[in-house]
């Protein structure tokens, strides 16, 4: 395994970000770390969240010799990034809600942000709105239950559409033309969200922008030279190495199947003392 790209989230939402990165770097090696023992992150005290994330990520970076870390979690990105960057010598990329492109795309100038309550209430989010959407009416919707519904869908293939419609009723009533998906879990249920909200609402997430940032940073750090070498080798054999790591005592058979279908050949539980 060459130096991997490490993607980190509390659950399976980061798979949506990993998929976007793989479109740009299809022959790279990847590690996916999901801290499902502490899901959802939005309900944790900030210092507890920071200590746990730093311990987990730094341990796995040392173990795998990762060349970049992607924090594919909006909650962790607003809380943990400074501590991770202080403890790591490699680039660390976070997630930024797509407020700016949403404001630029909106014709009605009525946009919304659907995220966890933690992301909705943080000063960073309101700063983005003030900076990039001051000409828009912005509605904020915080919902942790959608995170667990996305996890449930991936694990079982099932989605309670009646409950989803109830949760999205305030979004429908707001009469928006663009809705920002401010949690990386939400692209995993984008089809269901679109079904409830209708074709008149454009859904936007940050996956493509994150992938672009990863490529830029790898280029600046000269890691892209290594990536080209790996690409040439992988084109000959037609595969890349994919490893998944989780923190819960066990994961469901359905989730294991999903990870295998995504290309992960190694699925392993890891623990930390923090």
Curated annotation (Swiss-Prot):
Active site: residue positions: 73, 183
Q: Which top EC class is named for this enzyme in its record? A: isomerase
Catalytic activity reads: L-glutamate = D-glutamate
Keyword Isomerase recorded = yes
Residues bound to substrate: 9-10, 41-42, 74-75, 184-185
Q: Which organism is this entry from?
A: Shewanella baltica (strain OS223)
The protein's annotated pathway? Cell wall biogenesis; peptidoglycan biosynthesis
Family the UniProt entry places it in = Belongs to the aspartate/glutamate racemases family.
Which GO terms of the molecular function aspect are on file?
glutamate racemase activity
Protein task: Provides the (R)-glutamate required for cell wall biosynthesis.
What taxonomic classification does the UniProt entry list for its organism? Bacteria, Pseudomonadati, Pseudomonadota, Gammaproteobacteria, Alteromonadales
InterPro entries named among the record's database cross-references: Asp/Glu/hydantoin_racemase (IPR015942), Asp/Glu_race (IPR001920), Asp/Glu_racemase_AS_1 (IPR018187), Asp/Glu_racemase_AS_2 (IPR033134), Glu_race (IPR004391)
Q: What does the UniProt keyword field contain?
A: Cell shape, Cell wall biogenesis/degradation, Isomerase, Peptidoglycan synthesis
Among the GO biological process terms of this entry, one is: regulation of cell shape
Supply the EC number(s): 5.1.1.3
Q: What is this protein called?
A: Glutamate racemase
Is Cell wall biogenesis/degradation tagged as a keyword? yes
What Pfam family is a match, any one?
A: Asp_Glu_race
């Amino acid at each position: 395994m060459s130096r991997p790209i490490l993607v980190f989230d509390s659950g399976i939402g980061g798979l949506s970000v990993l998929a976007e990165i793989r479109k740009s770097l299809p022959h790279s090696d990847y590690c996916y770390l999901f801290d499902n023992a502490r899901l959802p992150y939005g309900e944790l005290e900030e210092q507890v969240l920071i200590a746990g994330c730093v311990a987990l990520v730094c341990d796995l970076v040392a173990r795998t010799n990762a060349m970049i870390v992607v924090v594919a979690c909006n909650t962790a990105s607003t809380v943990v990034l400074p501590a991770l960057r202080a403890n790591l010598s490699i680039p660390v990329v976070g997630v930024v809600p797509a407020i700016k492109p949403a404001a630029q795309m909106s014709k009605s100038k009525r946009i919304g942000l659907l995220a966890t309550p933690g992301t909705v209430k943080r000063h960073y989010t309101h700063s983005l709105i003030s900076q990039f959407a001051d000409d828009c009416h912005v509605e904020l919707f915080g919902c942790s239950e959608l995170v667990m519904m996305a996890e449930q869908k991936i694990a079982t293939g099932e989605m309670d559409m009646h409950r989803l419609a109830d949760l999205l009723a305030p979004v429908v009533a707001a009469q928006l033309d663009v809705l920002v998906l401010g949690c990386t879990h939400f692209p995993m249920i984008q089809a269901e969200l679109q079904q409830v909200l209708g074709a008149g609402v454009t859904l936007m997430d940050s996956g493509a922008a994150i992938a672009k940032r990863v490529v830029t940073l790898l280029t600046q750090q000269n890691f892209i030279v290594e990536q080209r070498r790996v690409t040439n080798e992988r084109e000959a054999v037609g595969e890349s190495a994919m490893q998944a790591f989780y923190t819960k005592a066990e994961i469901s058979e359905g989730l294991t199947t999903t990870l295998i279908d995504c290309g992960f050949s190694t699925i392993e539980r890891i623990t930390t003392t923090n």
